[in-house]
């Protein structure tokens, strides 16, 4: 073995298998770019992002951990969200939930 060497099996890994998802159209109505990380509670994102927040409650971006989506000013795009797992308890972010979903 060589330090840092990776042994990768053939095939694909499906992220968030079996979890509920929803696709929303999101528009940045602000004058600055907005970037949202993979595990940010999407319901609590920057108010300049316009979308159906009710459908985003308890959801996060359905992307690989540690990645993000950037919304340029005036840009609209469809994003897929996936339900949060675990205890489904939210603290922090913008302080809109602060407890159990």
UniProtKB/Swiss-Prot annotation:
UniProt enzyme class: hydrolase
GO-annotated biological processes: urea catabolic process
Catalysed reaction, written as an equation: urea + 2 H2O + H(+) = hydrogencarbonate + 2 NH4(+)
Protein keywords: Cytoplasm, Hydrolase
Highest taxon in the source lineage: Bacteria
EC number: 3.5.1.5
Gene Ontology molecular function: urease activity
Localization terms from the record: Cytoplasm
Subunit structure of this chain's protein: Heterotrimer of UreA (gamma), UreB (beta) and UreC (alpha) subunits. Three heterotrimers associate to form the active enzyme.
Protein name: Urease subunit beta
Organism annotation: Rhodopseudomonas palustris (strain TIE-1)
């Amino acid at each position: 073995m060589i330090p840092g060497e990776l042994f990768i099996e053939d095939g694909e890994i499906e992220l968030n298998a079996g979890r509920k998802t929803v696709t929303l159209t999101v528009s940045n109505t602000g004058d600055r770019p907005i970037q949202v990380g993979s595990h940010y509670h999407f319901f609590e994102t920057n108010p300049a992002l316009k979308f159906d927040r009710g459908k985003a409650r308890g959801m996060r971006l359905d992307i690989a951990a540690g990645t993000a989506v950037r919304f340029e000013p005036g840009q609209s795009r469809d994003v897929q969200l996936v339900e949060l797992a675990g205890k489904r308890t939210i603290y922090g972010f913008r302080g809109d939930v602060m407890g159990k979903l």
